[in-house]
C-alpha cells in the first residue's frame, strides 16, 4: 500500500467519504487550515446523511477550533457548512 501523502484540491467543499473514519479529523483539520489560509470564508464538509456519527464527530472537532466562527447543518446535502474567520 502506498502511504505517500495525497494532495487534495482546495475548493469550497471537501467530501469526506473517501477517507477512513480514523483519518477524517486530521484530513478535515488540514483542509480547514489551508482553506482559511487561501481566503475561503465559507466551506462545506460533506459527511453524508446516514446515522449521523460522522456528522457528530466533525461537529465536535469544529467546536474546538478557534478559527471556526460558526457552523450549521445542510441536511439536504449531508454536509456541515462552516464559517471561517479571516486570516490573522
Question: In which residue ranges do the predicted regions lie?
Answer:
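Long, charged, low-complexity intrinsically disordered regions
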Residues: 1-88
Amino acid at each position: 500500500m502506498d502511504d505517500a501523502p495525497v494532495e487534495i484540491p482546495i475548493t469550497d467543499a471537501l467530501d469526506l467519504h473517501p477517507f477512513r473514519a480514523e483519518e477524517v479529523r486530521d484530513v478535515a483539520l488540514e483542509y480547514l487550515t489551508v482553506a482559511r489560509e487561501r481566503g475561503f470564508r465559507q466551506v462545506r464538509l460533506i459527511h453524508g446523511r446516514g446515522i449521523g456519527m460522522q456528522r457528530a464527530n466533525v461537529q465536535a472537532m469544529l467546536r474546538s477550533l478557534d478559527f471556526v466562527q460558526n457552523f450549521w447543518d445542510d441536511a439536504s446535502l449531508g454536509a456541515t457548512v462552516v464559517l471561517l474567520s479571516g486570516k490573522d
